[in-house]
Amino acid sequence: MPVRVAINGFGRIGRLVFRAIYESGRKDIEVIAINDLADVNTNAHLLKYDSVHGRFPGEVSVAGDVMTVNGHGVKALSVKDPAQLPWKDMNIDIALECSGIFTKRDDAGKHLTAGAKKVLISAPAEGEDLTVVYGVNHGDLKPEHKIVSNASCTTNCLAPVAYVLHEAVGIEKGFMTTIHSYTGDQRTVDTMHKDLARARAAALNMIPTSTGAAKAVGKVLPALKGKLDGTSIRVPTPNVSVIDFKFLTSRNTTIEEINAAIEKAAKGPLKGILATYNVPLVSSDFNHDPHSSTFALHETKVIDGNFVRVISWYDNEWGFSNRMSDTAVAMHKVS
């Protein structure tokens, strides 16, 4: 039986999680309902027409409070308090918490109160039972993990690379910079924001700001806890980002050894999560790419045997959205 999911928050990530499930053609997950404060006609329109990912490759229609997608009816709700959602009556296995609001344990737990069996948060969380980067530590999932975080798009890009290279040559300490496309948390014109850098016009500036993505790797790879840090530079592109990761190794290594370890993982245990390439590509080449991380083999550098620099690309919307359904299915399997 497919895992029955409901999506709370039909914004940027909520819509793309929905779309990724349908575009993948996978039969092990089924969207039963969406909950969003916008009306169903607006949500259907934004699903059908996307400035970054193009038109939805299917049929979308609305009748009353039901959005029908490729012949499958999805109930559209508009409830402010997640505790009041009809998840018990709908027999929801997992609530996909995509609003960006309910990231603390007590808040996300309202979905459990409403009758969902588990909750998967599409963001870094506070007080969660486990943070998962699919492909790296989803094997740690246990039945008692009721509230799970899917980490961030950047952590999903960095963690597979760090995992492979720590196993191969050891990482003593490292620093990541993500050159990140602008997101909805920024402003289109100069106006108020609690982060004064993000208060500036997103499409006109390169904006240095913070990220917890590197430190969060320690949540999924305990051996690297406290060994990584990072920063973010938001740039005037609408989608696709890249990490620039520099680290000291536990022993001397070579460019060839680094690349061989990544290629082996990409063809083996991390196939579909981690990919590689060796030609001069640019950010738009990775738009709508479902991998969490696409490693640039020709960009690997090694200085004095133990200082390594690598880069890896990610579609910060689409890759992460595909991992949401992967993690949801993995959570259901251990129920």
Task: Briefly describe each language-model feature range.
Residues 4-6, 148-149, 243-249, 308-314:
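Short glycine-rich or small-residue beta-strand-to-loop segments that form or flank ligand, phosphate
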Residues 156, 252-253, 318-319:
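A generic structural signal for alpha-helix starts
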